[in-house]
Amino acid sequence: MQESKQLTPLMRQYNDIKSKNTDLIVFFRLGDFYEMFDSDAREASRILGIALTQRGGVPMCGVPYHAAANYISKIIKEGRKVGICEQVGTGEGKSKLFERKIVRVITPGTVIEDNMLQSNVSNYLVCVFTDKKGWGAAAIDVSTGEFWVTEQADDISLNGLSCMLAALNPAEILLDKITLDRVKSSMMIPGSVATTIVPREESSQIPSNWPSQSVWAGKKTALTCALTAIKYINVNEPGFKDLLIPFYKEISDYLALDENAVRTLELVSQNGARKGSLWHLLDFTVTPMGGRTLKNWILNPLLNLADIEKRQNCVSNFYDNPLAYEELKVILADISDIERIMSRVGTGNAGPRDLAGLARSLAVHGALKNWFDKYGAVVPYLKENILSKITVIEDLANLLNSAIEPNPPIKISDGGIIKQGFNAELDDLRNTKNNSSKTLAELCEREKAKTGISTLKVGFNSVFGYYIEVSKGQSGKVPFSYTRKQTLTNAERFITEELKEIEDKILHAEEKILRLETSLFDSVRKHLAEHIGVMRSFAKAIAELDVYSNLAHCAKVYKFTKPVIDESNILKAADLRHPVVEACLPLGSFVPNDIDLGGETQISVITGPNMGGKSVYLKQAAVLVILAQMGSFVPAASAHVGIVDKIMTRIGAQDAIAMGQSTFMVEMKETSHILASCTPKSLILLDEVGRGTSTFDGISIAWAITEFLYKPHGGGAKVLFATHYFELTDLENKYKGIKNFHAEVQEYKDADGQSKIAFLYKIKEGAGDKSYGIHVGELAGLPATVIVRAKKVIKDLEAKKGTSVSKKEDDIVGDLFSSPIVEEIKLVNTDAVTPMQALQMILEWKKRINS
Ligand SMILES: Nc1ncnc2c1ncn2[C@@H]1O[C@H](COP(=O)(O)OP(=O)(O)O)[C@@H](O)[C@H]1O
Ligand SMILES: [Mg+2]
């Protein structure tokens, strides 16, 4: 940065502002542009892909102010915060320098503008604090007004927090240094999320519009989080504070999905995109609220049987009543994002189009009432809920309908927002404006007749405004009531009281119209704001309607059936499918499979070749549970789901490498988390656990994990373990509740007599017998020479060992020590190695044996 004495006043002003807002990218208003300087400019030019220029040696880049929203949204999506610095003074006075200040801070967690948000995604600002034994959190979606808090006093390992963050996928997180360190070390926050260090707001002063003291008893950390978050929002968007009222939510009311499960099951995104996810597959919702609610339900399946059945019944009723669905869809199509519009109404940020959208949305009240008259029994509890609000909705709809033009301009200042007939004064002003020439012509005729001056005419100039002009020759006839304004060579100009009044009306009509429209618009907005509570719960009910009918539609489209749900330990389904994988394959080519866990079998060990369908089989079990417990039908011929409390998965290690830990370390961390926190009600998916280390290590660990999870007298978590360690199939012989399955393949000879395999994707009882690795390698296009060589090696190995490499042995330990290293020793051509090479080989073997 330059020495301050060399700086221009402007740059000094900039530096001053920037130094107080180091964590913001400052959008510094200069005329029609927002300029960024220095490090901000470098960062912004990279994020926005715009050119970097210079100003007095300082890097700089800029964007036109009218297109700023687009650029701001890009910066926010990178997890950065933007400070909007506007010219606030008049720019007069000695310095001629506009006074400037930050008028608004836009952060990823506090945006409300539609064009900076994704319509069907909640945008959470989360505040988290840990304490000695547990943690508390507040989650706020400022754009919709959703605000809840929770606390777990007894969760030293922060497992619950990790699950919660995985489900919320926050846009921004507030925390203190201690919490940040703990959360970071356990990799709970992806790097792209904005984190802000804030001091704890440890007041016991609860805002008067919040739930009473008793709710917060023993919820100190949760309250601190709520107060801290509100304080932060209040600084950035002061209007919000009173609109946000928290409720306490017990996290343990929902099925816990760990971070690995949310990601690898591809519930709401696949490699970062919505497409390819379960949510995308299921989403036929019509309203933005419906889309968000669906996502929310997928990530937060229920645990309470009665609650699940309540949802299931609604879905079932829609399923049985296709007409109800069709007719509802038409009504919902007119409803825009009421939740987000109401947030902007509440903060005074709503524009004309917001209110026009609201008008259209609320205009459905009549159709909705009719629909409930006809189909109310489909959603009994929503009927009461919505009908109890319908008079308020109707009143507001009438107000909006009479007040707001259906297709108004974007900005209030463009005018033409308030409808004709809404306000007499406004109509009058508009008439005045429109009739100005007529009124003047009338005045002119009247004055001519009164004075008998035939040359009298009415004119206008910018200096004197409206005037009456009389030619010099006739000026003698001018009455006393005229006031002379100007004398020309052959004419005199006058004004009269009446002309002045008309002039006033005309000249100021436009300005008055604008002012009046603005104030009328504001009063409508304020009136709406008084009903924000009703409107929000109306929006919520609409969202639920949307999701129920949507799930019924999915059941039809994807051929789902209604599962039996109870409190048992059973997880059983016939002809179960993975809906997302199925949708990607040609029609009818997905192979359904049965599953039966929790009865005789506690743990299934599934072996089989790569690409055999093991992982898909594991995942579809989890998807079954999630769908069932969110209230949906499921992709199976029949299904019985005993309520599951947690789904924990250890699938695919590759992606975590990016976060800076070794694959194996990540794998073991996640596995230890599973072992530490599973309960008899949990479903655990272990996919190739142990792959990240040497074979011996891997087998031993996988073996020990399975034994750990096994509960000989029942009451163990349900486990599906896919593995390519054939050795694990021995567990079946030792433990009654462990059962072997394999992904079936068919071996056949092709035209050239080469043996090939076909994947059948059928998961069958019993251990398979071979690892088909070489065949898979062949299918994957390994060079023929490699395949031939591999086949030769395996043949030699088998011949030398006198048995198949992967044959079962009674004692797994014996099997281990008869394997790879011994085989390698046997293979060494002692005539062809130098003593040095031999020594190196021995060292290498020793290392592997000792590792
Ligand atoms: N039940 C099935 N029916 C049809 N195709 C399947 C089935 N299961 C898996 N597949 C196909 O096989 C591929 C590999 O499946 P996957 O479960 O990943 O194999 P594995 O885990 O055994 O290596 C999938 O991407 C899918 O295209
Ligand atoms: Mg797999």
Curated annotation (Swiss-Prot):
GO MF annotations in UniProt: ATP binding; ATP-dependent DNA damage sensor activity; damaged DNA binding; mismatched DNA binding
SMART domains listed in its UniProt record: MUTSac, MUTSd
PROSITE patterns in the record: DNA_MISMATCH_REPAIR_2
Domain of life of the organism encoding this protein: Bacteria
Keyword ATP-binding found: yes
Binding residues annotated for ATP, in chain numbering: G608, P609, N610, M611, G612, G613, K614, S615
GO cellular component assignments: cytosol
Keyword Ion transport attributed: no
SUPFAM superfamilies for the chain: DNA repair protein MutS, domain I (SSF55271), DNA repair protein MutS, domain II (SSF53150), DNA repair protein MutS, domain III (SSF48334), P-loop containing nucleoside triphosphate hydrolases (SSF52540)
Pfam families linked to this entry: MutS_I, MutS_II, MutS_III, MutS_IV, MutS_V
PANTHER family referenced in this protein's UniProt entry, alphabetically: DNA MISMATCH REPAIR PROTEIN MSH1, MITOCHONDRIAL, DNA MISMATCH REPAIR PROTEIN MUTS FAMILY MEMBER
Its biological purpose: This protein is involved in the repair of mismatches in DNA. It is possible that it carries out the mismatch recognition step. This protein has a weak ATPase activity.
Family: Belongs to the DNA mismatch repair MutS family.
Full protein name: DNA mismatch repair protein MutS
Gene name per UniProt: mutS
